[in-house]
Amino acid sequence: MDKLQFINEQMTDLGIPYQLNEWNAPDGILKYPYTVGEFTEVATMTEDGYEESTLLLTVTTRGSWFELEGIKAKIKKRFPAGIGLCAETDSGSIAVFYAGSFPVPTGEADLKRMQINLDIKEWKGLN
């Protein structure tokens, strides 16, 4: 299991519709809310197998802001800031932490969007 699989499993467990990089409606019909994740990596200069990245989750709905806040609350509870959710992976260990959120303007009155950031720390090693 790697970080992509780990995140996908967590989002599925939370009941949050999630795909990586772009949303492709499984049946061709766009349903709200949906969440798209994108990774940014931080260059690390260590030899201990440590890697750091940020997952940018963009949640979109045609519902209310309360719906987005509810999704954020689920994510915040699963990946608490400062404590994180830790697990072993096939290649080492991972810790995922809630790192903030903000509304994203859409230009459409009924379309609401929020970005939720998760910090990810990985330690690669021989398992």
What residue ranges belong to the model's regions?
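Short acidic low-complexity segments
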Residues: 19-29
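A short, hydrophobic beta-strand-centered structural micro-motif
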Residues: 29-40
